[in-house]
Amino acid sequence: LADMGATIIKEERLTPYSLRYEIKYDKDLMAFSKKIESVPMVEILSIGKSLELIKDIGDAKQVCDRYGLSKIKGTHAIGHARMATESGVDIKSAHPFWGYPFSDVAVVHNGQLTNYWNNRRALENKGMRFMSECDSELIAVYLAEKMRNGATLAEGMKDSLKGLDGVFTYFVATKDSLGMAKDTMAAKPLVLYESDNLIAM
Protein backbone atom coordinates (compact mmCIF):
# COMPACT_ATOMS: atom_id res chain seq x y z
CA LEU A 1 0.00 0.00 0.00
CA ALA A 2 2.82 2.38 0.88
CA ASP A 3 4.43 1.62 -2.49
CA MET A 4 1.27 2.97 -4.15
CA GLY A 5 1.42 6.25 -2.25
CA ALA A 6 -0.87 5.42 0.66
CA THR A 7 -0.04 6.29 4.25
CA ILE A 8 -0.98 3.38 6.54
CA ILE A 9 -2.60 4.72 9.71
CA LYS A 10 -3.75 1.41 11.19
CA GLU A 11 -3.51 -2.27 10.24
CA GLU A 12 -5.45 -5.14 11.82
CA ARG A 13 -5.62 -8.85 11.02
CA LEU A 14 -9.25 -9.73 11.73
CA THR A 15 -9.28 -13.37 10.66
CA PRO A 16 -6.75 -15.69 9.02
CA TYR A 17 -8.14 -14.50 5.67
CA SER A 18 -9.02 -10.82 6.21
CA LEU A 19 -7.25 -7.57 7.03
CA ARG A 20 -8.57 -4.10 7.85
CA TYR A 21 -6.51 -1.07 6.90
CA GLU A 22 -7.09 2.56 7.72
CA ILE A 23 -5.13 4.61 5.22
CA LYS A 24 -4.71 8.13 3.92
CA TYR A 25 -4.90 8.28 0.14
CA ASP A 26 -5.93 11.35 -1.84
CA LYS A 27 -5.72 10.05 -5.41
CA ASP A 28 -8.00 7.95 -7.64
CA LEU A 29 -9.57 5.13 -5.59
CA MET A 30 -10.50 3.14 -8.69
CA ALA A 31 -6.90 2.98 -9.93
CA PHE A 32 -5.72 2.24 -6.38
CA SER A 33 -8.17 -0.65 -5.93
CA LYS A 34 -7.31 -2.14 -9.33
CA LYS A 35 -3.62 -2.12 -8.39
CA ILE A 36 -4.36 -3.88 -5.08
CA GLU A 37 -6.52 -6.50 -6.75
CA SER A 38 -3.83 -7.21 -9.34
CA VAL A 39 -2.06 -9.09 -6.52
CA PRO A 40 -2.99 -12.80 -6.77
CA MET A 41 -5.52 -14.02 -4.14
CA VAL A 42 -6.25 -10.46 -2.91
CA GLU A 43 -9.72 -8.96 -3.07
CA ILE A 44 -11.14 -5.75 -1.63
CA LEU A 45 -14.46 -6.24 0.16
CA SER A 46 -14.98 -2.51 0.66
CA ILE A 47 -13.07 0.72 0.27
CA GLY A 48 -14.33 4.20 1.00
CA LYS A 49 -14.22 7.32 3.10
CA SER A 50 -17.18 6.83 5.41
CA LEU A 51 -18.57 3.27 5.28
CA GLU A 52 -17.00 -0.05 6.12
CA LEU A 53 -18.55 -3.24 4.79
CA ILE A 54 -18.04 -6.43 6.74
CA LYS A 55 -18.94 -9.59 4.87
CA ASP A 56 -18.53 -13.15 6.03
CA ILE A 57 -20.26 -16.48 6.46
CA GLY A 58 -21.87 -17.43 9.77
CA ASP A 59 -24.65 -16.29 12.03
CA ALA A 60 -24.90 -12.69 13.27
CA LYS A 61 -23.18 -13.37 16.61
CA GLN A 62 -20.27 -15.21 14.99
CA VAL A 63 -19.67 -12.38 12.51
CA CYS A 64 -20.03 -9.70 15.22
CA ASP A 65 -17.53 -11.48 17.47
CA ARG A 66 -15.10 -12.24 14.63
CA TYR A 67 -14.91 -8.60 13.50
CA GLY A 68 -15.34 -6.86 16.86
CA LEU A 69 -18.48 -5.03 15.80
CA SER A 70 -19.36 -4.06 19.38
CA LYS A 71 -16.26 -1.81 19.39
CA ILE A 72 -17.06 0.03 16.16
CA LYS A 73 -18.54 3.50 16.60
CA GLY A 74 -20.93 5.06 14.13
CA THR A 75 -24.31 6.61 13.59
CA HIS A 76 -26.01 3.80 11.69
CA ALA A 77 -25.51 0.27 10.42
CA ILE A 78 -27.24 -2.25 8.21
CA GLY A 79 -26.98 -6.02 8.35
CA HIS A 80 -28.54 -9.06 6.75
CA ALA A 81 -28.97 -12.70 7.71
CA ARG A 82 -29.38 -14.43 4.38
CA MET A 83 -30.87 -17.68 3.16
CA ALA A 84 -29.30 -18.08 -0.27
CA THR A 85 -31.71 -19.33 -2.92
CA GLU A 86 -30.20 -18.17 -6.21
CA SER A 87 -26.46 -17.69 -5.64
CA GLY A 88 -23.52 -19.17 -3.79
CA VAL A 89 -22.91 -19.26 -0.06
CA ASP A 90 -19.56 -17.49 0.07
CA ILE A 91 -18.12 -14.19 1.25
CA LYS A 92 -18.52 -12.54 -2.17
CA SER A 93 -22.26 -13.28 -2.13
CA ALA A 94 -22.79 -12.18 1.48
CA HIS A 95 -24.61 -8.93 2.21
CA PRO A 96 -24.19 -5.97 2.33
CA PHE A 97 -23.11 -5.05 -1.18
CA TRP A 98 -21.31 -1.94 -2.37
CA GLY A 99 -21.19 -0.39 -5.81
CA TYR A 100 -17.61 -0.58 -7.05
CA PRO A 101 -16.03 1.94 -7.66
CA PHE A 102 -18.54 4.30 -5.96
CA SER A 103 -17.74 3.04 -2.52
CA ASP A 104 -19.85 4.84 0.05
CA VAL A 105 -23.16 3.09 -0.60
CA ALA A 106 -24.21 -0.23 0.97
CA VAL A 107 -27.30 -2.33 0.22
CA VAL A 108 -29.10 -5.31 1.74
CA HIS A 109 -31.99 -6.89 -0.13
CA ASN A 110 -34.71 -9.52 0.04
CA GLY A 111 -36.39 -10.81 -3.10
CA GLN A 112 -35.60 -11.68 -6.68
CA LEU A 113 -34.71 -9.41 -9.59
CA THR A 114 -35.98 -10.84 -12.86
CA ASN A 115 -34.06 -8.46 -15.14
CA TYR A 116 -30.71 -8.99 -13.39
CA TRP A 117 -28.67 -10.07 -16.42
CA ASN A 118 -29.95 -7.32 -18.76
CA ASN A 119 -29.19 -4.63 -16.17
CA ARG A 120 -25.86 -6.18 -15.25
CA ARG A 121 -24.66 -6.25 -18.87
CA ALA A 122 -25.75 -2.62 -19.38
CA LEU A 123 -23.89 -1.50 -16.24
CA GLU A 124 -20.77 -3.50 -17.11
CA ASN A 125 -20.77 -1.77 -20.52
CA LYS A 126 -20.64 1.55 -18.59
CA GLY A 127 -17.54 0.38 -16.68
CA MET A 128 -19.24 -0.80 -13.50
CA ARG A 129 -17.96 -4.02 -11.92
CA PHE A 130 -19.64 -6.97 -10.22
CA MET A 131 -17.93 -9.24 -7.70
CA SER A 132 -20.62 -11.94 -7.46
CA GLU A 133 -23.60 -13.38 -9.29
CA CYS A 134 -26.00 -12.41 -6.51
CA ASP A 135 -28.89 -10.31 -7.82
CA SER A 136 -28.76 -8.16 -4.66
CA GLU A 137 -25.44 -6.71 -5.80
CA LEU A 138 -27.19 -5.25 -8.84
CA ILE A 139 -29.08 -2.80 -6.62
CA ALA A 140 -25.87 -1.40 -5.08
CA VAL A 141 -24.18 -1.09 -8.47
CA TYR A 142 -27.34 0.42 -10.02
CA LEU A 143 -27.58 3.09 -7.31
CA ALA A 144 -23.82 3.74 -7.40
CA GLU A 145 -23.93 4.36 -11.14
CA LYS A 146 -26.84 6.80 -10.77
CA MET A 147 -25.11 8.67 -7.93
CA ARG A 148 -21.78 8.72 -9.78
CA ASN A 149 -23.62 10.59 -12.53
CA GLY A 150 -25.02 13.22 -10.17
CA ALA A 151 -28.29 11.74 -8.88
CA THR A 152 -29.14 12.00 -5.20
CA LEU A 153 -29.78 8.79 -3.28
CA ALA A 154 -33.54 9.53 -3.34
CA GLU A 155 -33.47 10.08 -7.12
CA GLY A 156 -31.51 6.87 -7.69
CA MET A 157 -33.89 4.88 -5.52
CA LYS A 158 -36.94 6.32 -7.28
CA ASP A 159 -35.40 5.43 -10.63
CA SER A 160 -34.68 1.89 -9.40
CA LEU A 161 -38.41 1.26 -9.03
CA LYS A 162 -38.70 1.72 -12.80
CA GLY A 163 -35.39 0.13 -13.79
CA LEU A 164 -35.47 -3.00 -11.62
CA ASP A 165 -38.06 -5.71 -12.16
CA GLY A 166 -39.15 -8.43 -9.76
CA VAL A 167 -40.38 -8.83 -6.21
CA PHE A 168 -38.02 -7.04 -3.82
CA THR A 169 -37.46 -4.88 -0.78
CA TYR A 170 -34.10 -3.26 -0.22
CA PHE A 171 -32.45 -1.10 2.41
CA VAL A 172 -29.56 1.24 1.62
CA ALA A 173 -27.05 3.22 3.67
CA THR A 174 -24.73 6.05 2.71
CA LYS A 175 -22.51 8.12 5.01
CA ASP A 176 -25.41 10.34 6.04
CA SER A 177 -28.63 8.65 4.87
CA LEU A 178 -30.73 5.53 5.12
CA GLY A 179 -33.44 4.55 2.66
CA MET A 180 -35.72 1.69 1.76
CA ALA A 181 -37.66 0.76 -1.35
CA LYS A 182 -40.17 -1.91 -2.29
CA ASP A 183 -41.43 -3.02 -5.67
CA THR A 184 -44.99 -2.06 -6.60
CA MET A 185 -46.47 -5.36 -5.35
CA ALA A 186 -44.76 -4.89 -1.94
CA ALA A 187 -44.72 -8.66 -1.32
CA LYS A 188 -41.46 -8.74 0.65
CA PRO A 189 -41.83 -7.52 4.25
CA LEU A 190 -39.91 -4.79 6.03
CA VAL A 191 -40.66 -4.20 9.72
CA LEU A 192 -39.94 -0.94 11.58
CA TYR A 193 -39.25 -0.79 15.34
CA GLU A 194 -38.83 2.52 17.15
CA SER A 195 -38.02 3.28 20.80
CA ASP A 196 -36.55 6.27 22.64
CA ASN A 197 -32.98 5.28 21.76
CA LEU A 198 -33.25 2.93 18.77
CA ILE A 199 -34.84 2.80 15.36
CA ALA A 200 -34.55 -0.58 13.64
CA MET A 201 -35.90 -1.97 10.36
Task: Give the positions of each predicted feature.
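Conserved short alpha-helical segments that host acidic/polar catalytic motifs at enzyme active sites
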Residues: 1-201
